Amino acid sequence: MAIEVSVLRVFTDSDGNFGNPLGVINASKVEHRDRQQLAAQSGYSETIFVDLPSPGSTTAHATIHTPRTEIPFAGHPTVGASWWLRERGTPINTLQVPAGIVQVSYHGDLTAISARSEWAPEFAIHDLDSLDALAAADPADFPDDIAHYLWTWTDRSAGSLRARMFAANLGVTEDEATGAAAIRITDYLSRDLTITQGKGSLIHTTWSPEGWVRVAGRVVSDGVAQLD
């Protein structure tokens, strides 16, 4: 039986360009044992399997898979799934993932999630001194035993930076927009940020000294795909 995959792009710019592709699948249609194979088949950096909220509930449950493995938390899948649920007419306040309970909110065309900084995977953070150095970085030059987050300021006073992320350890050579890495860099710098990542994806973060980081972005739909 063919499985329907809603294809989204998460963290687009204000014109709906760029963004990180995401597959969203109704978890009731797929046995847990089959999810990893489907995530690998889909080819997205992450695929999220969502258990829809019960009638009258504002909580959903989800699991997240890269092409290689299941992970307890990721940013762009939780933002994307939260947007997808609102589009279906079932907006939520919380999304339960293996790492914990993600807080969800909606602000105009922005969908936001709040998560603990320690839920995000560990990244090797590389502070670079110029946009040229960032652009010249080659994923092949970085060890594949950990994800690498490269960044440089574009406007330090405004909290604006440019970033790239390499995650060969998760089966992703370069990720276009990484919510979990945005959480880590926000916690690392202890300030609100506007992050342009990859080709032009846009992520907004809000830092809290209590260990929570809010990640917000725009989402667009690229239609529906079928997996056999």
From Swiss-Prot:
GO molecular function, one term: isomerase activity
Gene3D superfamilies given in the database record: Diaminopimelate Epimerase, Chain A, domain 1
Pfam families documented for this protein: PhzC-PhzF (PF02567)
GO cellular component: cytoplasm
InterPro entries in alphabetical order: Phenazine_PhzF-like (IPR003719)
Superkingdom of source: Bacteria
Listed GO biological process terms: biosynthetic process
PANTHER family, per database record: ANTISENSE-ENHANCING SEQUENCE 1, PHENAZINE BIOSYNTHESIS PROTEIN
Name assigned to this protein: Uncharacterized protein Rv2716
Originating species: Mycobacterium tuberculosis (strain ATCC 25618 / H37Rv)
